[in-house]
């Protein structure tokens, strides 16, 4: 029985997107425009009150949240592991997962739920004020084998690797339960700061590694992406190195595949491109498609999300993606 993807994600954040009429609130709270600040709940509440009455929207936040949402839209059966507070924000997070058809494996913490207030200036630039709260309270002790019952793969977002005990326990438990383990390296500076841990984690437990060019070079200590791909593939079963507008290189055993990008894509906002690429690729793997088919679906989902501001688009776009994915399944549309 295949239920697709289990997802461990420590930083469960609800995004509150607020459209500002001016940048005055940034000056009032001494927020550098375009920055991301970690704050306590008191300051975040004060900022939220100061923009009360302005247009806003709520959505699932975080890198893994993007991936899990896209996979659900692609028809995969998915679950989400994390911790929220005992509050209305936590209730929203759980309900949003259920509305997507995602199984919420959500613990309740003692702190308030994590939230990112994204202040959108009239010129479109975002200034983010983040309170992590209960999202930081998920511990290794809460990772139980029963969480992984019925799943094929655990996907780990690289942004949370600073909690070594949690990630190691999740990966080890998933492997013991017979799951594949996939990780997205997330950011080259995080890779550099956790290099020894990440290399050991990949060697010991990880089957699938996603990385962009900078992350791959940092992880492998190689100057060329092809050499980095080779190095990563020697540590795991399947390596995927994304090289921007040149597409992606994929290596499984002796098989190396280069897949292009969605040619029609307009680069409006690259937020979430890597998250959506992983979603498309893993969705293909869940259907046992070829590496080229998986890479093409990843390129389609990534190509579509960069055509919009943010990571949310309408049903018409998803219908277009579904149409293209069906062509990929029939090998009539490959990059």
Regions found by a protein language model. Give the residues of each.
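A short, aliphatic-rich alpha-helical micro-motif
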Residues: 2, 147-149, 202-203, 233
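Glycine-rich phosphate/adenosyl-contacting loop at the front of the ribokinase-like
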Residues: 3-79, 335
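Conserved phosphate-binding/catalytic region of the ribokinase-like
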Residues: 6-7, 12-20, 30-33, 225-335
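Substrate-binding N-lobe of the ribokinase-like
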Residues: 43-115, 319-329
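Anion (oxyanion) recognition and catalysis
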Residues: 72, 98, 175-176, 233
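Hydrophobic beta-strand scaffold residues
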Residues: 78, 104, 181-182, 239
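Conserved phosphate-binding/catalytic loop of the ribokinase/pfkB sugar-kinase fold
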Residues: 105-108, 118-161
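Conserved phosphate/ATP/ADP-binding segment of small-molecule kinases
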Residues: 171, 177-180, 186-258
């Amino acid at each position: 029985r295949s239920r697709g993807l289990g997802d461990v994600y420590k930083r469960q954040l609800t995004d509150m997107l607020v459209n500002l009429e001016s940048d005055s609130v940034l000056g009032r709270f001494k927020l550098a425009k375009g920055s991301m600040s970690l704050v306590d709940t008191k300051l975040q509440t004060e900022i939220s009150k100061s923009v009360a009455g302005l247009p806003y929207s709520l959505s699932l936040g975080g890198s893994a949240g993007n991936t899990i949402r896209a996979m659900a839209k692609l028809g995969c059966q998915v679950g989400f592991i994390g911790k929220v507070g005992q509050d209305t924000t936590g209730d929203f997070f759980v309900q949003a997962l259920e509305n997507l058809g995602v199984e919420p494996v959500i613990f309740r913490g003692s702190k308030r739920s994590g939230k990112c207030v994204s202040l959108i200036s009239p010129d479109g630039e975002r200034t983010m004020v983040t309170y992590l709260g209960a999202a930081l309270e998920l511990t290794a002790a809460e990772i139980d084998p029963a969480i992984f019952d019925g799943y094929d793969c655990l996907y780990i977002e690289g942004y949370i690797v600073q909690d070594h005990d949690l990630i190691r326990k999740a990966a080890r438990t998933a492997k013991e339960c017979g799951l594949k383990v996939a990780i997205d390296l997330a950011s080259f500076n995080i890779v550099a700061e956790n290099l020894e841990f990440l290399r050991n984690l990949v060697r010991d437990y990880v089957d699938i590694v996603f990385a962009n060019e900078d992350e791959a070079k940092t992880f492998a200590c190689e100057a060329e992406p092809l050499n980095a791909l080779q190095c990563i593939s020697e540590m795991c079963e399947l390596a995927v190195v994304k090289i921007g507008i040149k597409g992606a290189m994929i290596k499984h055993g002796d098989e190396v595949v280069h897949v292009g990008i969605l040619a029609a894509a307009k680069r409006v906002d690259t937020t979430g491109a890597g998250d959506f690429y992983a979603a498309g690729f893993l969705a293909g793997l869940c259907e046992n498609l070829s590496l080229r088919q998986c890479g093409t679906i990843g390129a389609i989902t990534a190509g579509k999300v960069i055509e919009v501001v943010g990571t949310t688009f309408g049903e018409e776009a998803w219908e277009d993606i579904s149409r293209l994915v069906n062509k990929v399944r029939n090998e009539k549309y490959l990059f």
